[in-house]
Swiss-Prot record:
Protein's name according to its UniProt entry: Bifunctional protein GlmU
Pfam families per UniProt: Hexapep (PF00132), NTP_transf_3 (PF12804)
Gene: glmU
PROSITE patterns according to UniProt: HEXAPEP_TRANSFERASES
Active site: H364
Amino acid sequence: MLNVVILAAGLGKRMQSDLPKVLHTLAGRPMLDHVIGSARQLQPARIIVVVGHGADRVKAAFEGQPGLQFALQQPQHGTGHAVQQAVPQLLEGDGEDDVTLVLYGDVPLVQPATLQNLLQARGRGVAVLTEVLADSTGYGRIVRDAQGQVCRIVEHKDASEAERAIKEVNTGILAAPTARLKDWLGRITNDNAQGEYYLTDVIGLAVGDGVPVGAAQPGASWETLGVNSRVQQAQLERAWQSELARRQLEAGVTLADPARFDVRGTLSCGRDVFIDVGCVFEGTVTLGDGVRVGPHCVLRDVAVQAGARIEAYSHLQQAKVGQEAVVGPYARLRPGADLGERSHVGNFVEIKNSVLQADSKANHLAYIGDADIGARVNVGAGTITCNYDGVNKHRTVIEDDAFIGSDTQLVAPVRVGKGATLGAGTTLTKDAPAGQLTISRARQSTIEGWKRPVKKS
């Protein structure tokens, strides 16, 4: 049985923020959410988040998540004291296979594979996640005995000169038998330079009790990087985005510049996808085979089918784009926009909660809201569906093969029949019959002999 305890009680003073540190985002998600996500991959019986500063806000951010519980650390007296607060909620069976894994809410990128390796490294005892650093200043040092076995961890402030020369450091992440961990937590003291209860002291207690202590290392150095300041947050953001870019490149995606690419959610790409510079992908985004995304586009919760093109500076949110459709440049698809195959949505066109079926086009300067547009429809420049009467929204229906002239207003609810034509400048307030020309503008006239006024001297 596996328990996971995540320490998330810290103030984060150096963040200079009223927001609890673990709620600051990395790749569009709270740091704590990354840790919980990795923990869930291990299928634990219980996840316990130890909260302190901003406890109510942290709880509210994750309220209702299954298998998630909270323990309060108030005041904060160190990492050992933090885990002590979770002890009453730890699930325990009958043997050494009952394990508690301790993670940190401000070390957001530790990967499930690394945690699996750590659990395997403990055997029937304890395991710590360690790393070798060129500059180990500030970290707890891993002290090994003559046989190379981990015998204790000493914090930097309590370390001797010889111990400070050690390059192998403690990441803070460990796994231990639950029953023994409870016992060791009851035996640690605050007799140290900080006057705190260190979780690391359980290693010395384990060795004293004859319990073997193993060690594992992360798959990548960025996995154990913590965040204590805005600078570190920005550095870790770039490290993670670089990793996400590498994964896309290895999967066959072409990135014009991997250093100018941001994923703040999940991006799934088919074959031969091209992504230009400065693009941001949020939520869940799917790009089909051969999709091309132009520079500086933002896609949030979007599905783009094969062969489609998203041109420069377009913003798409909760939208669907059909095969070989073209969007942009400078287009905006709002929630509920659904473009059929080979449809075109051009510059300065906004579409919201509307369907544009195959081969239809709205190439310039239009607003299409709450509309159902059939196939092979041409929507002229300056067209507006007037969908809101000040209280309620109404739908516009434009059937197949209709032609909507420029500068037309369609006052919903209204229907344009199949093959109908609306003359430029029409304000449509009644249904337009199929196959007919409907026009509402005044008849053009010329005033003979009219002259412009002359400016008086």
